Amino acid sequence: MTATKQHKKVILVGDGAVGSSYAFALVNQGIAQELGIIEIPALFDKAVGDAEDLSHALAFTSPKKIYAATYADCADADLVVITAGAPQKPGETRLDLVGKNLAINKSIVTQVVESGFNGIFLVAANPVDVLTYSTWKFSGFPKERVIGSGTSLDSARFRQALADKIGVDARSVHAYIMGEHGDSEFAVWSHANVAGVQLEQWLQENRDIDEQGLVDLFISVRDAAYSIINKKGATYYGIAVALARITKAILDDENAVLPLSVYQEGQYGDVKDVFIGQPAIVGAHGIVRPVNIPLNDAELQKMQASAEQLKDIIDEAWKNPEFQEASKN
């Protein structure tokens, strides 16, 4: 996609709770001029209905072409967003979904690429780091044009939780969750700050929360999805807005720094050949470059452990001949 292109087209694959919430966020925020929604044949009518329903909001926002799409419609899209996959059930971890969702991902990516698509993939289906890797493998695309939502939602949860504790606007809190979007993620406490004031210094001066409180805060952030799933069955609003933010950064060529699932080539020691959550600059051509926050020793160990866990799962999954044969990278 060129930064000057005026008509920007997004294809959404998966019209479930996350996908439909993302579509609504795009309409509500006036992002893109065209949105196609792909669903499996049994749910095609739902995609038709959602497209019609969403179109009724356009008089309040901005013009947009919205329709139930097929894979052929991906050919001239700027961005294909994959939310389709088996949902995470109560008691399941994101990594429990690997087997089911790898097969779904292979089918989707193969059909998108066969359409002649030459844009950017944005992956949100879980486990997102593993499925971002598989999207890269199945597509044969450059790593810069395959992006996962990564720890974008986790970092937003982290910032909001800190903001609530210390009584400031979350937009004034600058802090990241890195690693897997899942149980092995970690907080980068060493670089967390409030309006440029290091969090440690802020807490010394204001005493809003003690050390145990910080531990509890991180656990609540890490386990937020489990809490929500147990209460309402799924999470979708937060990730939908996170995806809309990433979409805007790509379509508007913002060169924004966002925490995403990006390919690792030794930025953090032995962390290689895996997609994992870290800040990166993203624009019209995908990932411009990772932003390599200098981690302290404890954080680096957590990053490496998180990556090793993901790598073990990927290596095990790729023993399946079906996935090996489909790999183009």
From Swiss-Prot:
Alphabetized InterPro entries for the sequence: L-lactate/malate_DH (IPR001557), L-lactate_DH (IPR011304), L-lactate_DH_AS (IPR018177), Lactate/malate_DH_C (IPR022383), Lactate/malate_DH_N (IPR001236), Lactate_DH/Glyco_Ohase_4_C (IPR015955), NAD(P)-bd_dom_sf (IPR036291)
Residues binding substrate, per UniProt: 88, 94, 126-129, 154-157, 235
MF annotations from Gene Ontology: L-lactate dehydrogenase activity
Sequence positions that bind beta-D-fructose 1,6-bisphosphate: 159, 174
Active-site residue numbers: 181
UniProt-annotated binding residues for NAD(+): 18, 39, 46, 71, 85-86, 107, 124-126, 149
SUPFAM superfamilies: LDH C-terminal domain-like (SSF56327), NAD(P)-binding Rossmann-fold domains (SSF51735)
Keywords carried by this UniProt record: Allosteric enzyme, Cytoplasm, NAD, Oxidoreductase, Phosphoprotein
Subcellular location field: Cytoplasm
Annotated Gene Ontology cellular component terms: cytoplasm
Catalysis performed (reactions): (S)-lactate + NAD(+) = pyruvate + NADH + H(+)
Entry's family note: Belongs to the LDH/MDH superfamily. LDH family.
Name assigned to this protein: L-lactate dehydrogenase
Gene: ldh
